[in-house]
Structures are given as C-alpha cells and as structure tokens.
A protein has these predicted regions:
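Divalent-cation-assisted or electrostatically stabilized phosphate/pyrophosphate-binding catalytic cores
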Residues: 166-189, 210-270
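Terminal helices and disordered tails flanking the catalytic cores of nucleotide-processing hydrolases
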Residues: 1-63, 70-73, 82, 86, ...
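Short, internal active-site loops enriched in acidic
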Residues: 99, 206-210
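A general structural signal for well-ordered secondary-structure junctions
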Residues: 5-6, 89, 152, 185, ...
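Acidic/His-rich, divalent-metal-binding segments that scaffold phosphate/diphosphate chemistry
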Residues: 34-180, 187-194
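Acidic/histidine metal-binding catalytic segments
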Residues: 122-148, 190-206, 224-233, 248-254, ...
Length: 270
C-alpha cells in the first residue's frame, strides 16, 4: 500500500520467515486473496529451500534421514493440490526458461512429472502394478511418491561439487565420471529410507536409455523402470528449456518438436 517494492531483513529474520512459509504452505496456496503468480513464487521458494536442505543434510549424513524425507513428502502433498489447478500450472510455467540450477531443476521436474502422470493415468498405473485395486486414494498416494522420486531424482549430485555442476565449458573425463556416479550415489542415500522400491529404482535408472547407451548400468528396454523413463523425458525437457552458461533457453514448443524427432530407440514413445 505504501508503494515500497523492497524491504531488507536480516538473516535470522529471513530464516524465521522461510520456516513460516514452509509450515503454512498449504494455507498460503489455498488463500484466495493472493494471486496465482504470488503463490507460484512462494511455492518455488519453499520447494527450492527444501531440496537444498535435502541435499546438504543427506551429504552430511550420507543418507536420507526421517525428518528430511517427511519435509519432502509434505512439500509434494501441497504441490499435488496446487498443481491440480490449470491456472496454477500456468503461473508455474512462467518460470520455464530461467537458469538451470540443481535445486530449481528438481522443483521443475516435480511439476512436469506430476502433470505428465495426471495426463497419462495408464502410465501411472504401471508404476506400481502390485496394487490389487487402483482407487482414488491409492492413486493420490502413488502420485505423491512419484513426486518424491521426481524431486529427489538428482539427490546423488550432493556429492558433486558446484564448480563441476555449474562449469561453463566441457567437462574433463574425470569430472564426467563423477557426474555419471550420481544415480548410484542417489540410490545409496535413499537405500535405508522409507521410500518405496520403485522410487529408488527411478533414482538409479533415470539416466538409462532405451537402447542401452545410458548410465550408470547400461540398462535397456523394459529393464528400465517406467518412472525412470518418465523422469528421463522430463529431465531432458527441463534441461533444454533452461538457460545455461553456454546456451540460451529453447522454447517449450521447439523442444517438444525436437524430442518427438528423437529416435525411438533412445527414449521409446512414452
């Protein structure tokens, strides 16, 4: 109301403010008096902080602890409600094309994965075929766990230095080998967690290609978990639509056209 667009707060107050946003995220996203753009910005901020904390905590402990996993699950639960609204997705889509950073990338992979699976319920049902029935309650729980897998898919990069992840130029052979280990590191961090087996498989397999040319195991075809194949597509889409130090972002339409033209033996037809 005063017309002031910026205020400065000290670090301690900022931490308290961020904790408040995370604790009350569900109420904030349901608040009808806030614009969708404002809510999308808050959701993005909270999710980025949760992912960042997940990386740092897991790196320190060498595993995903109970409290960190619970924070991630709570975030995804709120995300499912928010992303269900078309106007919310439109607000979130305005962030496509921003810089590619590991924490922000994890958040966008969550958005895209949830949207993709909602539009393709037949694929969602294949992710955990052990369900004897597939009612709405199970569907919501399965979608939540898929969201957890999506937001944690790169958790193994916690072991890779930011200098390598953000390097402006080609990687050395040693640096590339370190990058290629992140799915294995991710599995190791989640191995003793309560995450379902299919989430752990998705984290391990998300850089495998349908023709066996991916990493870290060189799996092919149906040996790659179907959620990992979804994450592979979403991962590539976000990377290509994001700005990098060495390239500008491509438009979503252009990327979709390119991906449709990718040989089917590379990513199949999902």
């Amino acid at each position: 109301e005063s017309g002031q667009k910026e205020v400065f707060i000290d670090l301690e107050e900022e931490i308290i403010y961020e904790q408040y946003l995370e604790t009350h995220l569900g109420d904030i996203l349901a608040n009808q008096s806030s614009s969708e753009d404002q809510k999308a910005e808050i959701f993005s901020k909270v999710s980025t902080n949760v992912v960042k904390d997940s990386f740092e905590t897991s790196l320190g402990l060498g595993t995903m602890d109970y409290d960190t996993l619970r924070r991630t699950q709570s975030l995804v639960k709120n995300a499912l409600i928010f992303i269900a609204e078309t106007h919310s997705l439109k607000a979130l889509s305005k962030m496509i094309g921003h810089d590619y950073k590991t924490y922000e990338h994890a958040t966008k992979v969550l958005w895209f994965t949830v949207a993709f699976l909602r539009k393709n319920p037949d694929i969602l049902e294949q992710i955990e075929p052990t369900y004897l029935t597939f009612d709405e309650t199970q569907k919501k729980e399965l979608l939540k766990q898929c969201g957890v897998g999506a937001i944690l898919h790169d958790i193994g990069k916690a072991f890779v230095s930011q200098d390598i992840l953000n390097k402006n130029g080609p990687l050395t052979t040693i640096e590339w080998e370190m990058i290629k280990r992140h799915p294995l590191n991710g599995l190791a961090m989640l191995l003793d967690s309560e995450c379902p087996v299919f989430v752990k498989k998705a984290v391990l397999h998300h850089h495998e290609d349908f023709n066996g040319s991916g990493y870290p195991m060189g799996l092919d075809g149906q040996n790659i978990h179907i959620l990992a194949r979804v994450l592979r597509i979403v991962d590539v889409f976000d990377a290509m639509t994001s700005r990098r130090p060495y390239k500008e972002a491509m438009s979503p339409t252009m990327v979709a056209q390119i991906m449709i033209g990718i040989p089917p033996e590379k990513i199949k037809n999902e």
